[in-house]
Amino acid sequence: MSSKFDASKFTTDTARPLPIILLLDCSGSMSGEKIKSLNLAVRRMLNTLSKEESRISEFLVSIITFGGNAKVLPGPTNATESNFGELKAGGGTPLGEALKLAKELIEDKSTTPSRAFRPVTVLVSDGVPTDSWESNLDDLIMNGRSSKSDRMAMGIGPEAYEGNGRNMLEKFISGTDHKVFEADEAEKIQSFFKLVTMSVTTRSKSVNPNLVPKDGELEERKPTGERQRDVFW
C-alpha cells in the first residue's frame, strides 16, 4: 500500500531579492526635459526588470525622491508589481534627508531582508544639495549594512559633475569600481539607466549575484542596433 503524499517534505524555491534603491533629484532645476527623461528612464528600467524577474531572483525596488522634501514612494516593491507614477520637479535639493531614508531602508530587515543579495543604491542629481548631507553620507557609506552596498551615481549638467557637485558624487561612489556618469544633456539620462539595468540583470544571472561587474565590462557586453532595443527597452 502506497504512503500518503506529505507536502511538508517538499519545498518551493523562493526568489531572493536584489534590492535597488533609487535616489532621484526632483528639485525645481530638474523641470522640463530633465524630469521628462528621468520619468521615461525609470519606467523603461522597471519594465525591463519585470521581464527579467524569475523563480530564483527578483528586483526589490525602492524610490526615494528629494525635491522640497525627501520621501519614499510606495515600496520596496518587486519590479513586476511596481506602479510607478509621474515624478514632478519642484523645491530645493534635500539630499541629506534622502540619504537618511536610504540608510533606514537598508538597515531595516523588514524592508531589506538578510537573505537579500547585495543592494545597489543609485543617486541621480543635477546640482549641489541644499541641506546638510555630509554626515548622513558618511553614515551610509561607512557604517552598518549600507556600507556594503554597491553605489552608482549620475550628475546631470556641469553644476552636478563639476566642483562641489562632483565632489559629492565622487564621495558617494567611493569604495566601488564605478565612475561618475556625466549627462550633459537630458537624453543621456536614458544611457545611465540602461547601464544600471545591465548591472543588476547581469548580477541576477551570475553564479554569485553579490559580485558587481565593472562599468567597462558592461559596455563591452552591450548589444547593438535592434537587439539592444529588444533586450533592454
Cite the ranges covered by each PLM segment.
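VWA/integrin I-like adhesion module and closely mimicked acidic/polar interface patches used
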Residues: 89, 127-175
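…and closely analogous acidic/polar surface helices at protein-protein or active-site interfaces
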Residues: 18, 28-58
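Short, charged loop segments at secondary-structure junctions
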Residues: 30, 69-101, 128, 143-147
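Von Willebrand factor A/integrin I-like adhesion domains
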Residues: 153, 158-213
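Exposed acidic/Ser/Thr-rich ligand/metal-binding surfaces
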Residues: 96-149
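Short beta-strand-loop
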Residues: 8, 57-86, 161-174
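Acidic, polar low-complexity linker/tail segments
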Residues: 1-21, 26-36, 107-108, 113-114
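Extended acidic, low-complexity intrinsically disordered regions
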Residues: 186, 207-233
